[in-house]
């Protein structure tokens, strides 16, 4: 494989991992803010909100993990 294609693979993997990480960071920030807002409004629902918070945070955090796997696949398997 010539070096231009290899360079494009590295750049595409970096873009995939970078945008997924930025998106997850923004999503977790918004999620945390909404959790605090909901907990401040109705303190008696904190256990329910906390459970839902951690479930959704796990789903949001899974996206960058998948993109890291795809990025590593692009770097090592496709080159």
UniProtKB/Swiss-Prot annotation:
Coiled coil ranges: none
Membrane topology: Multi-pass membrane protein
Family annotation (SUPFAM superfamilies): F1F0 ATP synthase subunit C
Alphabetical UniProt keywords: ATP synthesis, Cell membrane, CF(0), Hydrogen ion transport, Ion transport, Lipid-binding, Membrane, Transmembrane, Transmembrane helix, Transport
UniProt keyword annotation of Ligase present: no
InterPro entries assigned to the protein according to its UniProt record, in alphabetical order: ATP_synth_csu_bac/chlpt, ATP_synth_F0_csu, ATP_synth_F0_csu_DDCD_BS, ATP_synth_F0_csu_sf, ATPase_proteolipid_c-like_dom, F/V-ATP_Csub_sf
Bilayer-crossing regions: 11-31, 55-75
Classification via Pfam families: ATP-synt_C
A GO term for molecular function: proton-transporting ATP synthase activity, rotational mechanism
Compartments, as annotated in UniProt: Cell membrane
Record-annotated site: Reversibly protonated during proton transport: 61
Record has Cell division as a keyword: no
Quaternary structure and partners: F-type ATPases have 2 components, F(1) - the catalytic core - and F(0) - the membrane proton channel. F(1) has five subunits: alpha(3), beta(3), gamma(1), delta(1), epsilon(1). F(0) has three main subunits: a(1), b(2) and c(10-14). The alpha and beta chains form an alternating ring which encloses part of the gamma chain. F(1) is attached to F(0) by a central stalk formed by the gamma and epsilon chains, while a peripheral stalk is formed by the delta and b chains.
Annotated family: Belongs to the ATPase C chain family.
HAMAP family named among the record's database cross-references: ATP_synth_c_bact
Name of protein: ATP synthase subunit c
Species this protein is from: Wigglesworthia glossinidia brevipalpis
């Amino acid at each position: 494989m010539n070096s231009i294609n290899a360079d494009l693979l590295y750049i595409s993997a970096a873009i995939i991992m970078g945008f997924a990480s930025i998106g997850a960071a923004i999503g977790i920030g918004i999620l945390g803010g909404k959790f605090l807002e909901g907990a401040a409004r109705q303190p008696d629902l904190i256990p329910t909100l906390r459970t839902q918070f951690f479930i959704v945070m796990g789903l949001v955090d899974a996206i960058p993990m998948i993109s890291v796997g795809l990025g590593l696949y692009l770097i090592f398997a496709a080159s």
